[in-house]
Amino acid sequence: MSDARAQTLITIAELASLLQGGAPVVLLDVIDEKGAAPEDRPKIPGALSVHLATDFSDKPTKLSGRRPLPKIMDLQANARRWGISRDSQVVVYDSSAGAQASRAWWTFRWAGFRNVRILDGGLAAWTAAGKPTSTDILSEATKAGTVALQAGHMPTIEAQQAARIARSGVLLDARGKAAFVGEAGKPATGHIPGAKLAASGDNIAGGQFRPAAELEAQFAALLGNDGSEVAVYCGSGNAAAHAIAAMHSTGRTPALYVGSWSAWSADPSRPVAQGAEPG
């Protein structure tokens, strides 16, 4: 496994080995508001249930988009409650091929905590490998951590920068094709003019991230090699974080438009393109 991929993803076998060896691993089961309640889903033994909407995001405003970044001190308090210290190894996972876990991974790295990886394949791959699960509902560690976090360690952009990058660089839309194309007669649907469709689902095969060589070829074809500025958005920043994780595994670190389409479309003065072409 390449260094970049190993810094982004952890395999089922690697995690099982760490847990068996007693390594200081903090396991976080990442849930969104549409997912199953903690009591309705099995977990990897010892995993803490965490929520994107409340633990990794601030309260949204009219123009912020659905998933604004958390206040750094709130995130730090949560991380300490989960038992995270500077030397902890954090593994985030979900039951949706990394769609939620990737946003948690990105947020930790944005906050300066780099020793965090996404469990490749998540809970589905864990159970498919015959590994044990638990129904215990845990929300905090038995011993608080001491980690210190600081915002700004991953690149982010706002709407004005997104518009500029769409013209002069590469702006990727990580939503599915239907959302990108939009609906005729509905002006708040479609995409940012100039953006390219790069659905985050294209980075997955069989519930896991595609092999490194496939992702490298995919992104090389999509981005070129002229050094253009690259940024990613989606509906609310989750699928975009998943796409960024995939690119990060190949050594790339594009910027995230955190507000994404939910922020862009909240301002009716902003232009919208519809159809399959960038526009």
Predicted regions and their residues:
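Cytosolic catalytic domains that perform sulfur/thiol-centered chemistry
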Residues: M1-G279
